[in-house]
Design a protein with these regions (language model features):
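Flexible, surface-exposed loop regions and adjacent strand-edge segments
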Residues: 2-3, 37-45, 94-96, 127-135, ...
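Structural signature of outer-membrane beta-barrel domains
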Residues: 17, 25-33, 63, 82-84, ...
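Hydrophobic core residues within well-ordered beta-strands of beta-rich domains
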Residues: 52-54, 73, 93, 110, ...
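Extracytoplasmic gating/loop element in the C-terminal half of outer-membrane beta-barrel translocons
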Residues: 106-195
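Short loop/turn motifs that connect adjacent beta-strands in outer-membrane beta-barrel proteins
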Residues: 14-21, 64-73, 86-88, 102-110, ...
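Outer-membrane beta-barrel transmembrane domain signature
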Residues: 107, 191-214
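Gram-negative/organellar outer-membrane beta-barrel architecture
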Residues: 1-76, 90, 140-141, 145-152, ...
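Residues on the lipid-exposed face of transmembrane beta-strands in outer-membrane beta-barrel proteins
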Residues: 6-12, 26, 54-60, 79, ...
């Protein structure tokens, strides 16, 4: 998908670590590199669509560090309404949260996080560029967008209207020199994405089967930010999924 546009908004802090955020965005999107069957799958028919949307988020965050939390929790609910003019009309709902608990004087941290999401068309079907996609950092061991329904013609991911994912992870510096800035992690990821308004030509569009993986990682705090190296293997997958053993990222680890 080729997408251009901009967003602007404001965040307001309240008592007890609660925050509110309001955002407005306008953008145009167009599906490119489609297979013969993908025109009916995307719902966009090669057109450039204008989206005008407003979002509201409320959350609570008590984590001690946004990039590298060792204790605390966060929870966030967001609603996005698209239909303030434009060609795209939908309501998207997201709920996400996480919890972090230190042990052994913070030398070992247990982290649990998860998210669920749903998008509904308002008088229109949900097009591909607005659906949820899963894989990569969300479910390590799978390629980016590697989980879920796929175009039978091109094999490309087409996304879904429903999503959930979660992670259980242990991070520790036990056995590592403190000044090195290195830690190790073991983790399990899981999730699924499914349901499209254009099921023709799609592989298993309504398959809700959970995918999962197990893996190991190395986390390194550097002057340019946290670096993460992950090795993971799927423990539950579908034949049409795309897997990926090694992944690298810069920034937040969970």
């Amino acid at each position: 998908t080729n997408r251009t546009g901009f967003n602007f908004g404001a965040r307001f802090s309240a008592a007890n670590d609660v925050y509110h955020r309001v955002t407005y965005g306008i953008s145009t999107s167009k599906i490119t590199n489609r297979s013969t069957s993908a025109t009916s799958i995307t719902g966009e028919n090669g057109k450039s669509l204008l989206k005008s949307a407003v979002s509201y988020t409320i959350g609570k965050d008590t984590r001690d560090n946004y990039f590298d939390p060792t204790e605390g929790f966060f929870t966030e609910i967001s609603e996005t309404f698209s239909g303030v003019g434009g060609d795209v009309n939908f309501l998207r709902s997201n709920l996400r949260g996480g919890y972090y608990k230190p042990y052994l004087f913070k030398s070992l941290v247990l982290g649990v996080k998860g998210r669920v999401g749903h998008i509904s068309g308002l008088g229109d079907d949900v097009t591909q560029s607005e659906r949820f996609f899963l894989g990569g950092r969300d479910v390590r061991g799978f390629d980016s967008n590697g989980v879920g329904p796929r175009d039978k013609g091109s094999g490309g991911a087409v996304g879904g209207n429903n999503i959930y994912s979660g992670t259980v992870e242990v991070v520790s510096n036990l056995g590592v020199t403190k000044d090195a800035g290195l830690r190790w992690t073991v983790f399990s990821d899981f999730g699924s994405v499914w349901a499209t308004d254009f099921p023709s030509g799609v592989t298993k569009p309504d398959d809700q089967a959970m995918r999962s993986s197990l893996g190991l990682g190395i986390l390194w705090n550097t002057v340019i930010g946290p670096l993460s190296f992950y090795w993971a293997t799927p423990t539950a997958e579908q034949s049409h999924d795309n897997t990926k053993t090694f992944q690298f990222s810069i920034g937040t680890r969970m």
